[in-house]
Design a protein with these regions (language model features):
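Bacterial N-terminal signal peptides that target proteins for export
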Residues: 2-12
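N-terminal signal peptide c-region/cleavage motif recognized by signal peptidases
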Residues: 18-21
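Carbohydrate-interacting regions of secretory-pathway proteins
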Residues: 24-454
């Protein structure tokens, strides 16, 4: 054998050994036609296994049903194929557990879920926190991925869990990227969703080729989609690579200054408390403005309202004060308010002063894709403002795009002309502007303030 052929043979042999080693890292989740090592929780939907394929069949008037592994998993890559009958909702639990429930003798399943959604909403492969926090990564964050799932066809799926990062994939494309530390270990489960009445009774969901890699789990290289980081005041390595920077690190507010030119923190009107920027009720110092101006940008933040409170996040902010007068910072406002208890939410026109609205200009959608958009009082909400280079601006609230408009359009100009801002020339039309956190003398807290320029 000549030297070249010997070298090629060694290379091929090494490749085969490497592939065989990689294949050995995978284990089947099912053993033949047996549910040995699995247990059912919740409702009484029917599960059967034949030729390595699991079929779940819906049963009317029973809670969500789960066929789960007895074993818990921490870091892993899970792959499977799934087929869902049109009209049925389902999911795959991971890093999940049970908690006591008076209505369920074996406890209530809770934890992360890879959604299987045949409805028009089409959020398959989004991440839902079953019986806990609700939607963590709705597929509205990655709109093109809504069209990947095929009802009543076999689809390939992949879940990657390594440390505090979770990525999901559907038919070879990345759907979600979550950073969260709530649960780091738990079982894997196959869900058949509860149904009301008999219309969808007997509907089926099928799984096959379930396999798991716990020996060498790795995250796939990010595909540049939006990353939802729930860990407060932090940036993951992929976020940094996308150009995100923190505007508050949980300890110091060095990226902000008082709009009145005084130290808002020495007056105790603003305070860093429990890793959040908190406005004290009854404070008089005023707003905080960013030290830097921004053009096209994506701004992420979390906010927490107390009952009856009012605040706001303003952007493309400019100083409209006359020469020699005190600063008069004005800009477009993402309204933050208790819709039920603060009187200003009832003012304006058709709800354009409610939470997440473009204040005094455009009301937020109260429902998106048949779902009521939540606005929490006393717990954290996720806000997001995206100002694209083409002038389009979006307001997001807890995973829903609730306002969208174009700065400088005819509609925008007409709305401004009929608002409290009509006397300010070129209102909201500057190429760049400051960000502003509004102090309305009510207790409101902010955290996880981060931005990237587009």
């Amino acid at each position: 054998m000549d030297k070249l052929n010997w070298t090629l043979t060694k290379t091929n042999l090494s490749l085969l050994i490497s592939l065989a080693s990689f294949a050995d890292d995978w284990d089947p989740l099912l053993s033949g036609n047996s549910f040995e090592g699995w247990e059912q929780h919740g409702g009484v939907a029917k599960y059967e296994i034949k030729n390595g394929e699991v079929t779940g069949t819906s049963v009317a008037n029973t809670p969500n049903s789960f066929m789960t592994t007895a074993r818990a998993y921490t870091d892993f890559v899970l792959e499977f194929e799934v087929w869902v009958q049109d009209g049925l909702n389902s999911g795959v639990q991971f890093r999940s557990n049970t908690k006591p429930d008076p209505d369920l003798s074996d406890g209530r399943v809770f934890g992360y879920q890879f959604e299987l959604d045949t409805a028009e909403r089409a959020w398959t492969a989004g991440i839902y926190d079953e019986a806990n926090r609700g939607w963590l990564y709705p597929v509205s964050y990655n709109e093109p991925a809504r069209y990947l799932f095929k009802n009543e066809q076999w689809n390939t799926a992949r879940i990657e869990c390594v440390g505090n990062e979770v990525q999901t994939f559907l038919n070879g494309k990345q759907v979600s990227h979550l950073v969260d530390e709530k649960t780091i270990s738990g079982f894997i489960g196959l869900q058949v969703h509860s149904i009301r009445g008999s219309e969808h009774e007997g509907y089926k969901v099928r799984w096959r080729n379930l396999r798991i890699n716990t020996q060498s789990p790795k995250l796939s290289p990010p595909e540049g989609i939006y990353i939802r980081n729930i860990k407060p005041n932090s940036l993951s390595s992929p976020e940094k690579a996308q150009g995100w920077t923190l505007l508050f690190n949980g300890r110091k507010a060095n990226e902000w200054k008082s709009a009145k030119g005084i130290d808002a923190f020495s007056k105790k009107d603003w305070e860093v408390k429990d890793e959040a920027l908190m406005i004290h009720a009854g404070s008089k110092v005023g707003d905080l403005v960013s030290k830097k101006a921004y053009g096209a940008f994506e701004f992420d933040f979390e906010f927490r309202l107390t009952e009856g409170a009012n605040s706001g996040v303003k952007y493309f902010v400019s100083d409209f004060a006359a020469p020699g007068q005190a600063a008069n910072y004005l800009g477009l406002e993402y309204q933050i308010i208790d819709d039920n208890l603060h009187p200003d939410a009832k003012q304006g026109v058709v709800g354009n002063r409610t939470g997440a609205s473009l204040y005094d200009l455009i009301p937020r959608y109260q429902e998106v894709q048949t779902r009521k958009v939540p606005l929490h009082i006393g717990s954290w909400n996720h806000g997001r403002i995206v100002a694209f280079p083409n002038g389009t601006v979006q307001h997001w609230l807890n995973g829903f795009n609730v306002v969208e408009y174009e700065r400088g359009s005819n509609i925008y100009d007409a709305l401004v002309a009929r608002s409290k801002y009509e006397k300010y020339e070129n209102f909201g039309l500057e190429a760049k502007g400051l960000l502003l956190l509004q102090n309305h003398n009510d207790e409101v807290s902010y955290r996880s303030l981060k931005i990237r320029e587009l």
